[in-house]
Amino acid sequence: MSGRSYQVRTFGCQMNVHDSERLAGLLESAGYVPAPEGSDADVVVFNTCAVRENADNRLYGNLGHLYPAKKSNPAMQIAVGGCLAQKDRSVILDRAPWVDVVFGTHNIHRLPVLLERARHNSAAQVEIAEALEVFPSSLPARRASHHSAWVSISVGCDNTCTFCIVPSLRGGERDRRPGDVLAEVEALVAEGALEITLLGQNVNSYGRSLGDPGAFAKLLRACGRVEGLERVRFTSPHPRDFTDDVIEAMAQTPNVCPQLHMPLQSGSDVVLRRMRRSYRRERFLGIVERVRAAMPDAAITTDIIVGFPGETEADFADTLDVVRTARFAGAFTFKYSPRPGTPAAEMDGAVDPAVVSERYGRLASLQDEMSWAENRAQVGRRVEIVVAEGEGRKDSATGRLSGRARDGRLVHLLVTGPHAQEGLVRPGDVVETVVTRGAPHHLTADGPLLTHRRTRAGDAWAAGRAIAGDTPRPDRPAVSLGMPQLRPSAPAAR
């Protein structure tokens, strides 16, 4: 088995990205090696999403493209995991019988065993657990970045949004104890990470199953005491549970970034009620106002669904009004697509697709205007950037580097002056510069760097490079061991 190559393809949210790092770590711990870029892998793993309709189409389209390779090389293995696998189960084998392994959201640790069993038995293996067997953070991980890392604080969700299938696929919320979370954060910082993102389907409800409703604000403050941790982000909060103690912790903890991604979904109270979102527009806007009062430079982004069943032109106008009032720095906008098994899929009042597309276009145009205005306001500001690898798709053509400012904005920067020597500024290093241009989806900084600080993350990136001829090839971080739980997690309060 040693030396077989693998590739993990990830669809969906940050939870899936984090899970894919665990899948890669599990495979490498079992003797697999990453497939070189552009080559065929011996094992291809799809970590799937089930939130939107195009997720299904994307998976089955990719599986279809792999069929000729599988037919010509029967030893190749294909595995499908994640939310769509949890939902579709045997349907995947009906539609793509050349798949070797199907596993769900609750048993990702079983992947190496299932691959070996499928190979040994020459038969597809379908194993879907109905409850979480092992907390993902106890598994080894192959992190994609030297300078940043995801840290799960909870899995699952207790909300009942009528459009969302996630709770039925990932189960009810289960919280990690704060000591376990902080132990993982400290271990990641010891490895060189500068930035961590706390992950949960609803971070604001963190701690309820532990009997401490204020646990999330306390966790943010505790992260502020971790030496060497420069940036803390989190996703995703829920407006219903967003409390002032969290805003105070964000504003008073220096390494918590001035950034908030808070899903709106709709600006209409009527639609929010049908969505069962448990808050109304005034509450949402009140949170935005209080966040901006505490952190005037905070970048606030959101999610919005267009064309939910029953949405009228007046409802849509309410959404546009919230977008104007909130002045979002950016938004992920989606056309509603019914997901089988959700209450919304059975609702009357389906909106004509042509109307949905027209509204979607208007929303996108308005949000681009708002984003552009917000980003133009950044021109002339001094920003701190952690240089990243692969953030800017055109970096090689433009000669720029890219990275994220503290507020999460993407910045493309030109390295000039004494710092311009090739290789001097590395992914993971921290620089300061001045914004020279604002575009709808990014900032540009073409002036000279004001400061450049080498970091342990940059050192790790440099140490991990392998030289092929004269071309440096950056390597990824080594596999991190999973974090043992200090105490058993309490069962979720239901």
Curated annotation (Swiss-Prot):
Catalysed reaction, written as an equation: N(6)-dimethylallyladenosine(37) in tRNA + (sulfur carrier)-SH + AH2 + 2 S-adenosyl-L-methionine = 2-methylsulfanyl-N(6)-dimethylallyladenosine(37) in tRNA + (sulfur carrier)-H + 5'-deoxyadenosine + L-methionine + A + S-adenosyl-L-homocysteine + 2 H(+)
Gene: miaB
Ranges where the MTTase N-terminal domain occurs: 4-120
Domain TRAM, chain residue ranges per copy: 376-449
Annotated binding of [4Fe-4S] cluster 2, by residue: C157, C161, C164
Key words of the record: 4Fe-4S, Cytoplasm, Iron, Iron-sulfur, Metal-binding, S-adenosyl-L-methionine, Transferase, tRNA processing
InterPro entries per UniProt: Elp3/MiaA/NifB-like_rSAM, Methylthiotransferase, Methylthiotransferase_CS, Methylthiotransferase_N, Methylthiotransferase_N_sf, MiaB_methiolase, rSAM, rSAM_horseshoe
Protein name (database record): tRNA-2-methylthio-N(6)-dimethylallyladenosine synthase
Known role: Catalyzes the methylthiolation of N6-(dimethylallyl)adenosine (i(6)A), leading to the formation of 2-methylthio-N6-(dimethylallyl)adenosine (ms(2)i(6)A) at position 37 in tRNAs that read codons beginning with uridine.
Entry GO terms, CC: cytosol
